Swiss-Prot record:
Residues 1-110 are annotated as: Disordered. Component of the eukaryotic translation initiation factor 3 (eIF-3) complex, which is involved in protein synthesis of a specialized repertoire of mRNAs and, together with other initiation factors, stimulates binding of mRNA and methionyl-tRNAi to the 40S ribosome. The eIF-3 complex specifically targets and initiates translation of a subset of mRNAs involved in cell proliferation. The gene is NIP1. The keyword Secreted does not apply. GO terms for biological process: formation of cytoplasmic translation initiation complex. The modification Phosphoserine is found at S98, S99, S103. It comes from the Eukaryota. Keywords: Cytoplasm, Initiation factor, Phosphoprotein, Protein biosynthesis. Residues 608-783 form the PCI domain. GO terms for cellular component: eukaryotic 43S preinitiation complex; eukaryotic 48S preinitiation complex; eukaryotic translation initiation factor 3 complex. Component of the eukaryotic translation initiation factor 3 (eIF-3) complex. The keyword Protein biosynthesis applies. It is found in: Cytoplasm. This is Eukaryotic translation initiation factor 3 subunit C.
Amino acid sequence: MSRFFSSNYEYDVASSSSEEDLLSSSEEDLLSSSSSESELDQESDDSFFNESESESEADVDSDDSDAKPYGPDWFKKSEFRKQGGGSNKFLKSSNYDSSDEESDEEDGKKVVKSAKEKLLDEMQDVYNKISQAENSDDWLTISNEFDLISRLLVRAQQQNWGTPNIFIKVVAQVEDAVNNTQQADLKNKAVARAYNTTKQRVKKVSRENEDSMAKFRNDPESFDKEPTADLDISANGFTISSSQGNDQAVQEDFFTRLQTIIDSRGKKTVNQQSLISTLEELLTVAEKPYEFIMAYLTLIPSRFDASANLSYQPIDQWKSSFNDISKLLSILDQTIDTYQVNEFADPIDFIEDEPKEDSDGVKRILGSIFSFVERLDDEFMKSLLNIDPHSSDYLIRLRDEQSIYNLILRTQLYFEATLKDEHDLERALTRPFVKRLDHIYYKSENLIKIMETAAWNIIPAQYKSKFTSKDQLDSADYVDNLIDGLSTILSKQNNIAVQKRAILYNIYYTALNKDFQTAKDMLLTSQVQTNINQFDSSLQILFNRVVVQLGLSAFKLCLIEECHQILNDLLSSSHLREILGQQSLHRISLNSSNNASADERARQCLPYHQHINLDLIDVVFLTCSLLIEIPRMTAFYSGIKVKRIPYSPKSIRRSLEHYDKLSFQGPPETLRDYVLFAAKSMQKGNWRDSVKYLREIKSWALLPNMETVLNSLTERVQVESLKTYFFSFKRFYSSFSVAKLAELFDLPENKVVEVLQSVIAELEIPAKLNDEKTIFVVEKGDEITKLEEAMVKLNKEYKIAKERLNPPSNRR
């Protein structure tokens, strides 16, 4: 029975000798390793057991040298057995021989390399690829590979491994290739662009490593052979100069990482959030104002890039962008005598090199601060377009408009303080002025005063404006002077679109807050309506809004004819909501073509708080149509020759024609119904019911001077009802008592006389006032009475029916 199943079996060392032949020779070769204590020169493969750890095996006869390993781990290799004579080579004891590992490598086993060695191998691969690309002038490959090795260098420096010698060789290699290539020989645009990019980068990198490059140029062969042990942390192939100060190293690392981020912007494979996190970390280690400024100039656009594919920037990210812009402006305020950022500064080749001081001792940095403010404002408007306007979120979001306006004013004052050239100042202030007007032109005078006061309260005391002075803030004419001053400055610009926009802003504000006649004269004298259809959609929408506001301004003064004339052409359109920019962004996205970008669609609509109430527009136009067309319709049907006026499909005449055809006529429900019932009452001469129906319209509450308007409207309804009554009943009466008419329509007698005399003279009605001016005598004319009209109509129908029932005999 096998010894493994025998309960009293005692293992004998000698018994294993007979089982040695079970080991194959191939397995013995793989496990062969000589022991330090083995001195026997034998051809057998007993080296599997000849480790010198126990003395018990020394007593074994030479006959037992062929014995099979025994014990609970007999099947393991000698290196892993506890009693097999071999110690574990993974637990490197004092008697471990590295020849085992070397033999494994010779047998083709995988070698584990350190991260440092892998990095060097990757750089060597880049060197080889660039060498191959040089032969074919493949500058696209050279540019990509040089960009790759630059990123590898950043990895090496992050691990404190220094600059590899192979990197210096690659820089020298690319520099020689650039010098040996003429740009004129590169016909392909993409290749030429890659060549220029590589040329700029290698120039910068070579300048950063001047000492190492000079060392390599002097003796390239011995460059790799020199020891690189300047510091303990350096390794083969890496050099770190210990003579450089820590501050300089930190500064170089700051701008190196910043340049890497700048180069990575715009690439599809780059994670924007990781770039933002890296920039935020750089801000924590920045020390000098120049470092803060350059970091913020990179961080702010990176935040906007992160949300470029979204409908609008998330509110938390928007607030982060707002805080970054505010911090940047605070730094610029504190260092205004040392550093200034504007769009007219000279560009610099390397970001780590601060610009040179000008004659005033100021270092001017190239950048566009107001571009950040504009983008922030655009994202704010997009968010308003995407948020439900009837929700509380919209009102909460709208509170941030004051913060935006503060930044606009702050940027304007910074430009005035830093730009000395008048031409540059005018160019720079154009966009801030347009944005300021864009935020205030549609508001009332009181709201604008509140916004201006809040904005000036956060402005540093060092800033003053010669265009919009704070000293006049308490003046009653401050807002009027502000709007007029900004518009006047913009109207002098060479850009025609800016000129028209500024004039329209001023006209809208004037029509809303001041008086109609001034706004009308401004519109006519400016001729802003000329070629308005050739400009972009946003300017056309603004023009339409100005026209509507001009009509509403005329209605507030009870200038009914002027209001009707202004609104008639505009309301004849079936797309009033679209031409006023008051449709939803979602609807525009569905109806617009695929080629229209999100910004183009956003320019075609306005936020909800800027809308003009469409119900108010309809009510105003219908009321004007009521007061103009009802008397004329009555005169026409009475046989009086009147001048026909153009009317739109939305006029009261169309509504009355449709109403008379209805089989069921219920009480008024909609706004149009109330105006319609007011018209029916006016046709009967019942002015009190007409006024009653008009006053029940709730849209009048949107007018700032509602009671004044309604009182003026009531007086006008009385006058037009008097005219309608006179036209309707002059065929039935031979005379009209002035006192009776004054009592009936609640008007003074002199007013009744004035109205009827003007109507008689205008329409040439055969009637006159007696000498006592108490009675209007009506002369009988060619017109027929209602009874005679019915008789003529009945006679005509009788003849038609007779011919139909009794046809002539000669007709078939």
